[in-house]
C-alpha cells in the first residue's frame, strides 16, 4: 500500500482526539486561554453537559483582528518563543487547543484587543472556515461559542457519559482552575441554573473555603521549602475525609496536576490517621524551578515529569506530617519517648482483695506534684491516705480524692490542656473540665492511639512473660508462612513466638502495655491482617498496619467502667502522646464544647 500524506483536516481531527476527550476538555482549554490573557472575570455557560453548547467569556487582553485566523492554525501561539521552551509559565503553549476544538465542532470566536476600536468575529465548522470576519459587539476581551461538539466525529459521542456526569466533570475542571487562580472571578451556569459563583479573592485560603467549605474551621496550613522547591497550601484534619481523591487538589507552578507521586505523598502522610480506602482534603501548590520540571509531556498538559522525584516526595510528606503533628490534638507532640513499661490502667480491680494504690494513681500524684511548687505536699499526703477506703466506699472515696487532691490545686488546670475528669457517661465517654470548656473523650479511640504510638517506639517496648505460654493452632499454611516471615519483626513488637510444629506456635511473651488480652485471638487477627496486606507495601508500612491491629484489640473497650484516677491518667498520657487527637481509623478521640456555646444553648448569651 502506498504511503500518502494526510490532509490538514484529517490531521486536525486525529490530533483533536488527544486534546479534546470530552466537553470538560474544551472548557479547560478555553478557560486556560482566558487566564493566560490576564482576565479578572471569566464566565462559562454550558447546555446538555457541554455537548450542545459551551460559551466562555472573559475580560482579558483579547485577540487582534489580524490574528483571529492565525489562532486557528495548529502550533500558532502568542505565549512561547524558542528561548522560552524550558521555562514555560503559561497554562497553554502548544497552539493546539483552538484548531483541535474547531476540527470537531462548530465554533465562533469573537474578540476585542485592549487597544482596538471594535471587536471582530470569525467562525469555523468541522475545521473549515465559514465566511469572512465580521464586526461584533463586545466591550473587551474574548467570547467563544462552541456548538455541537463531536458532530464531525460522531463515534466519539458514544463514549461520552451521562449529562450529569459530563457536567460534574466540567465543575471539577473549573474548581481546579478557580482554586489556584483565586484573584479571578468565576461563574459557571448550566442552562438557567448557576452551578458556581466565585468572587475575586485575595488568598488561596479564602478561595479554598468557597470551593470546599470543609476547609473552614478544619484547615491546617502547609509551608515547606528546600533547595528552591516550595510547598504551600492547606489540608484538613483527618476527620474530614471522603471515599474518592477528588478533594485532593495539587498544583505545580500554578498548573492543576493529577500526579500519582503527589497523591501518594498525601496518602502516606495520612496513613496513620485515616482508613486506606479514604482520602483527605488537601490543596497543595508546589513551586519548582522551571528547569526541574517538564510540563510538555502530554497535549492535555495535566501530567508533568519531575527531575528529582525523591526530593519532591520528601518535601510533600515532611510538610504534611509537620502540619498534622502540630494540630492533631490541642497540644504539641512531645519528643520524649513514651513509657512503655506503664501497666494497663484499665484492668478491672479485684474487688475481693484489699486495694493498694495503682501505678497510675502514683503517676497521677507525680503529675500533680511536679513541677508546680504549690503542689509539693500532695505526694506526702498520699502516703498516709487510706486506699482501702476506696474499695469499701468507692463513690465517696473518689469524690474525696477529687475534692482534696484536685480541686484544691486549681492552678494545675492551666498546665493540662485536657483538664480533669469529672465523670464517665455510658461507660464509654469521659467528661473532663477545663476552665472555659468541656472535653468529651472517646475512651477506646483515645487509648487505641496511645497503645499504637507506644508500640511504634519499638526500642522501648517491654515484654511481659506469660505465666502459662499460649499454644496457638494455625489452620492454614499461609498463616504459618506469615509467622515464619515476620517472626523477627513480631519480636521487635514485643511478641516472643516459637514455632512448635507445622501448624502450631507457642506465644511466650507479649508487649506489657497490652495487659490481659486474648492471646490466641490477637495472633489470629495479626495473621489475617498480614495475609490481607499487599506484597508491594514497604516493610515499615506493613509493620504499622500490624501495630494498628494490635492497638485496636489491646485497648480499653467501650462499655468499660473507669475510675477517676484511670480517666485522669488517660488524659495525661494523651497530652504527652503525638497525634492523640485522632484514633488509627481517622475518628476524633475527643471533642470540645466551649462554655460560651453551652451558655448560648441556655440563652445566657
Swiss-Prot record:
SUPFAM superfamilies: ATPase domain of HSP90 chaperone/DNA topoisomerase II/histidine kinase, DNA mismatch repair protein MutL, Ribosomal protein S5 domain 2-like. NCBIfam families: mutl (TIGR00585), PRK00095.2-2 (NF000952), PRK00095.2-4 (NF000953). This is DNA mismatch repair protein MutL. InterPro entries: DNA_mismatch_repair_CS, DNA_mismatch_repair_MutL, DNA_mismatch_S5_2-like, HATPase_C_sf, MutL/Mlh/PMS, MutL/Mlh/Pms-like, MutL_C, MutL_C_dimsub. Disulfide bonds: none annotated. It comes from Wolbachia sp. subsp. Drosophila simulans (strain wRi). GO terms for molecular function: ATP binding; ATP hydrolysis activity; ATP-dependent DNA damage sensor activity; mismatched DNA binding. GO terms for cellular component: mismatch repair complex. The lineage of its organism: Bacteria, Pseudomonadati, Pseudomonadota, Alphaproteobacteria, Rickettsiales. Residues 334-362 are annotated as: Disordered. HAMAP family: DNA_mis_repair (MF_00149). Belongs to the DNA mismatch repair MutL/HexB family. Keywords: DNA damage, DNA repair. This protein is involved in the repair of mismatches in DNA. It is required for dam-dependent methyl-directed DNA mismatch repair. May act as a 'molecular matchmaker', a protein that promotes the formation of a stable complex between two or more DNA-binding proteins in an ATP-dependent manner without itself being part of a final effector complex. GO terms for biological process: mismatch repair. Residues 345-358 have a biased composition (Basic and acidic residues).
